[in-house]
């Protein structure tokens, strides 16, 4: 994530994102290459980088998985998820050029001989493509095999850079542990094999343009930062809503739930970006130092505050877009009496000078009314209301993260006519309208940053552990008590009634989905 100004002319000529020069040539070794994440998300992201000349033409992608297939089969499988027809990037010549750089390697994740052979193959790729020994390992496997892969890479002497001018890095997908103890154990295993500077713990939400733009919006403009504190802000709401159910992830979701899957990672990462202080410099160390300070300033949950300030829910049967959908307990692979949370909401306090007394309301859930992720900054009312009765809405600044990325500011304005009637209006900025095209896929942004050695948007070990330290008391309290009467919200709704009570007890209300 390089910080530099681009002129309007440059943006209009090159599109909303471009690379002035390709990255270093490298080998990308993708573990779990036959899985859904690799095929549906990572391959399109890598192709996007190649299409926009962000990858060196000589890059090599080596897929590693247990599934047996040939190089051609692997290329065919990857090609099924690349742009087609009128989609942006649907260029047959460029797709063919991209796919020819893909190769496949069959092996078990705990097979030492397979990793020795992998090391030999990488030496061959270095010579074949002039890659200079640069290697990016990507763990797109189930989390239970992370330590197996890392141990085998270490034993095969693949975790250290080959020389002063080469680099070796590893991207690790979430979930990074399932509680504080397991996160610490995994960090210890990773750091036995790699230096922290080599490790890129990925959270794809942080690759979205609006999320990155929070930093520019706050610290690159002189308008809003003076208001970004307890003197002017009444509350903050962060919503990550999905209309989808668990799809094919029931086995994983039964062991996770909304609190582990979304709140601990995506939502707390957004919160730290909203609440952080200005970094001394815009580099990975400075930004991540400020984020960890926020996480460490969050008020710990006690058993009492969990029951008061945290809500969990599970969806029942309902309708999405006018079509009936089953409840969570009726989904294939889910236990008939499952107590897994598909919705979580909480009130959070950041105990520092900037945010003292400002509640942060966080929520995330599946099978909600609309797929929508946003950060809403709700400002305090004017100290003296000269105009009464017409404009009942507070001023708000909303950063829309998905599905449509953009920023909107709402305020009161007089309606035309002789009477002093006031209604809320909005000023909107949308990426596609301003820049004329969709923003870069989040995974493409993050992979590109990793190849270029920029860790700004990736988690550090201490921030992962701090997030788990906050969430652990909630999970432990839930584990020691019976779940609420599930299901407690129908699919297609805004969530359980108890979530409305969470804000209602403070005289506030959630923004509608």
What does each of the following model-derived ranges do?
Residues 1-172, 176-513:
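Secretory/organelle targeting and membrane-embedding segments
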């Amino acid at each position: 994530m390089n910080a530099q100004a681009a002129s309007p002319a440059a943006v209009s000529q090159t599109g909303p994102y471009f690379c002035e020069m390709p990255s270093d040539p490298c080998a990308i070794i993708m573990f779990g290459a036959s899985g859904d994440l690799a095929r549906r998300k990572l391959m399109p992201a890598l192709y996007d980088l190649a299409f926009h000349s962000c990858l060196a033409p000589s890059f090599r992608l080596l897929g590693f998985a247990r599934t047996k297939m040939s190089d051609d089969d692997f290329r065919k499988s990857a090609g099924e998820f690349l742009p087609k027809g009128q989609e942006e990037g649907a260029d047959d010549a460029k797709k063919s050029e991209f796919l020819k750089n893909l190769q496949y390697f069959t092996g078990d994740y705990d097979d030492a001989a397979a990793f020795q052979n992998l090391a030999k193959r990488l030496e061959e790729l270095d010579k074949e493509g002039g890659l200079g020994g640069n290697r990016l390992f990507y763990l797109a496997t189930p989390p239970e095999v992370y330590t197996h892969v890392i141990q085998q890479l270490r034993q095969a002497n693949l975790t250290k850079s080959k020389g002063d001018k080469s680099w070796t890095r590893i991207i690790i997908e979430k979930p990074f542990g399932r509680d504080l103890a397991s996160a610490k154990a995994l960090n210890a295993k990773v750091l036995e094999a790699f230096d922290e500077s080599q490790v890129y713990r990925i959270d794809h939400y942080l690759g979205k343009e609006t999320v990155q733009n929070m930093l520019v919006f706050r610290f690159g403009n002189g308008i809003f930062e003076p208001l970004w504190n307890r003197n002017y802000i009444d509350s903050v709401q962060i919503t990550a809503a999905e209309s989808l159910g668990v799809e094919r992830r029931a086995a994983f979701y039964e062991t996770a739930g909304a609190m582990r899957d979304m709140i601990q990672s995506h939502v707390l990462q957004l919160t730290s970006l909203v609440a952080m202080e200005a970094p001394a410099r815009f580099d990975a160390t400075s930004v991540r130092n400020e984020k960890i300070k926020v996480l460490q300033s969050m008020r710990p949950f006690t058993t009492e505050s969990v029951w008061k300030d945290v809500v969990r829910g599970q969806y029942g049967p309902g309708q999405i877009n006018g079509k009936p959908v089953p409840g969570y307990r009726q989904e294939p692979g889910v236990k008939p009496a499952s107590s897994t949370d598909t919705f979580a909401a909480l009130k959070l306090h950041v105990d520092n000078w900037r945010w003292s007394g400002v509640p942060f309301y966080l929520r995330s859930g599946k099978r909600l009314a609309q797929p929508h992720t946003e950060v809403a900054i709700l400002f305090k009312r004017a100290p003296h209301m000269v105009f009464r009765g017409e404009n009942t809405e507070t001023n708000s600044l909303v950063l829309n993260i998905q599905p449509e990325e953009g920023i909107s500011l709402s305020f009161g304005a007089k309606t035309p006519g002789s009477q002093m009637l006031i209604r809320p209006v909005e000023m909107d900025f949308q990426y596609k309208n301003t820049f004329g095209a969709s923003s870069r896929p989040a995974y493409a942004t993050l992979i590109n940053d990793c190849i270029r050695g920029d860790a700004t948007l990736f988690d550090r070990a201490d921030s992962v552990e701090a997030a788990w330290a906050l969430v652990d008391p909630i999970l432990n309290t839930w584990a020691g008590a019976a779940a609420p009467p599930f299901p407690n919200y129908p699919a297609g709704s805004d969530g359980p009634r108890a979530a409305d009570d969470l804000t209602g007890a403070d005289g506030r209300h959630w923004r509608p989905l």
